[in-house]
Amino acid sequence: MKPSSSNSRSKGHAKARRKTREELDQEARDRKRQKKRRGHAPGSRAAGGNTTSGSKGQNAPKDPRIGSKTPIPLGVTEKVTKQHKPKSEKPMLSPQAELELLETDERLDALLERLEAGETLSAEEQSWVDAKLDRIDELMQKLGLSYDDDEEEEEDEKQEDMMRLLRGN
């Protein structure tokens, strides 16, 4: 009362069928054909490689053999060397003209007014004002001018006035 062995095998899993010599030979030929096809397609260099995208004008890789379209002179020509222009230097002003420019400088006047009003300037502005005031002092010394001349004249006038008053004239 054993179940038949042939029925149980057919229902469970079938025995692996052996391939014939012809089938094995056919598979070998297919593998050899696939192996031959490895690498680039014939004529890929001339045709430009694989162009899977339909639009050739956009995003298509350029042919590396096609170069620039700019004309190249074939004869020997002398190169024209361009002279480098020196940077235009600031024109040298006379001390008198430079002093007048500094005295009429709007930025300097505005910053000095801010200082007189009690505002504090940034370090950059303060250093700029100091440099300009130092330059004004240098120019005034070169020209023989000083702020003290005006003050001395006023003091001399005051002294003379005092002397007149004391003398009683």
Swiss-Prot record:
Gene inactivation effect: Dispensable for cell growth, cells lacking this gene have a shorter lag phase.
Question: What happens upon changing R167A?
Answer: No change in ability to stimulate Der GTPase
This entry carries the following GO cellular component terms, namely: cytosol
Q: Where is the sequence biased in composition, kind Polar residues?
A: 49-58
**Which residue spans traverse the membrane?**
none
Q: Which UniProt keywords apply?
A: GTPase activation, Ribosome biogenesis
Is Nucleus among the key words of this record? no
Renumbered to this chain, the Basic residues biased-composition regions fall at 10-19, 31-40
Q: Where is the composition biased (Acidic residues)?
A: 147-159
Specify where the region named Arg/Lys rich lies, as residue ranges. Answer: 17-45
Molecular function (GO) terms listed?
A: GTPase activator activity
Per the record, which residues fall in region Asp/Glu rich? 148-157
- Note the InterPro entries from the entry: YihI
Q: Which Pfam families match?
A: YihI
| Chain segments carrying region Not required for interaction with Der/Enga | 1-45
Q: Where is the composition biased (Basic and acidic residues)?
A: 20-30, 160-169
Region: Disordered; residue ranges are 1-98, 144-169
UniProt induction comment: Highly expressed during the lag phase, not expressed in later phases.
| Biological role stated in the UniProt entry | A GTPase-activating protein (GAP) that modifies Der/EngA GTPase function, negatively regulating cell growth, probably via ribosome assembly. Stimulates the GTPase activity of Der; a construct missing the first 45 residues is even more stimulatory. Does not stimulate 2 other GTPases (ObgE and Era). Overexpression inhibits cell growth; precursor 16S rRNA accumulates, the 23S rRNA is 6-7 bases longer than usual, and 50S ribosomal subunits are improperly assembled, leading to 45S subunits lacking proteins L9, L18 and L25.
The record's misc note reads: This is a highly hydrophilic protein; there is a stretch of highly charged residues in the N-terminus and a stretch of acidic residues in the C-terminus.
The record's subunit annotation is: Homodimer. Interacts with Der/EngA via the last 78 residues. Interaction with Der occurs at a 1:1 stoichiometry, suggesting the dimer dissociates to interact with Der.
Family per similarity comment: Belongs to the YihI family.
- Write the protein's name: Der GTPase-activating protein YihI
Supply the source organism for this entry.
Escherichia coli (strain K12)
